[in-house]
Amino acid sequence: MKIEASTIKEIQLFKYYRLIRKWACKTYDIKEADLELLLYLDCEDKFTRDDFIKGMHIYSWDKSRWDRLRKAGWIDVWRQRNRTSRKYTIYKTSFKSKQLILRIYRILLGEEDVPSSERNVFYKNKTYTDKVMNTAMERMKNDPTR
């Protein structure tokens, strides 16, 4: 299925991408570069550590990114190496990361709203940035074109 550029513009897919990305990163305690790398790896489906390193070239260098994503449960082992016939371990994005990515897609498409409960990290209004994000989220929710 091929999507035209005019279709993406028509549905305003990326109108609130930055806001949704910031919300996801703060809510799920993940860095923006890590989230975007997970989006890339999710499109790859299954990948090796070498594929991960190749995908990481366009992001800022972070030596501990692999370990951090593995320990936090964003990347799972799909097939373990056995040193004879399987020369390397194959990984995949975890259920946790797939659910986050699907939620981001649903919010971008307007099928779901960003949660606005008191438990939301932005609604604690600790910093000026949180207040600005709250205002932007309210504008996004009330946008009739969304």
PLM region spans:
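Short alpha-helical segments that sit at the start of domains
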Residues: 4-36
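Short, cationic-aromatic polyanion-contact patches
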Residues: 27-31, 80-106
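Short acidic, hydrophobic short linear motifs in intrinsically disordered regions
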Residues: 43-56
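A short, basic/aromatic helix-end/turn motif that makes direct DNA contacts
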Residues: 54-59, 81
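Short amphipathic alpha-helical interaction segments
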Residues: 57-72
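A short, conserved structural fragment
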Residues: 70-83
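Short, amphipathic alpha-helical interaction segments positioned at domain boundaries
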Residues: 95-128
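Terminal interaction helix/tail motif
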Residues: 116-146
